């Protein structure tokens, strides 16, 4: 195998590894509806508005949510 082909193989393998790491980080990021701002939702027994999270069973941690209600198949998390 010549040196140029070996170098191309090394660069290709490194690119695959870095791309896989970025995809793994993106996979664990919570998916909130709307890129710039979240879609709002209103629960019948709550005052104000909440954040709508798509296809989740519970509210994600780290956002200060204290209560929720289900808007099937999504969840509405409070406080906003």
Curated annotation (Swiss-Prot):
Cell compartment(s), UniProt: Secreted; Nematocyst
GO-annotated molecular function: ion channel inhibitor activity; potassium channel regulator activity; toxin activity
Tissue: Moderately expressed in the ectodermal tissue from the distal and proximal tentacles, body wall, and oral disk.
Propeptide residue intervals: 20-31
Chief location category: secreted
Signal sequence bounds: 1-19
Biological process, per Gene Ontology: regulation of blood pressure
CC annotations in GO: extracellular region; nematocyst
Alphabetized UniProt keyword annotations: Cleavage on pair of basic residues, Disulfide bond, Hypotensive agent, Ion channel impairing toxin, Nematocyst, Neurotoxin, Potassium channel impairing toxin, Secreted, Signal, Toxin, Voltage-gated potassium channel impairing toxin
A Pfam family: Defensin_4
InterPro entries: BDS_K_chnl_tox, Myo_ane_neurotoxin_sf
Family per similarity comment: Belongs to the sea anemone type 3 (BDS) potassium channel toxin family.
The protein's name: Kappa-actitoxin-Avd4f
């Amino acid at each position: 195998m010549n040196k140029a082909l070996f170098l191309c193989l090394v660069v290709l393998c490194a690119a695959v590894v870095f791309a896989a790491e970025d995809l793994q980080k993106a996979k664990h990021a919570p998916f909130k509806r709307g890129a710039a701002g979240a879609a709002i939702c209103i629960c019948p027994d709550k005052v104000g508005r909440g954040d709508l999270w798509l296809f989740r069973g519970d509210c994600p941690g780290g956002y200060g949510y204290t209560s929720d209600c289900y808007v099937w198949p999504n969840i509405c998390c409070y406080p906003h």
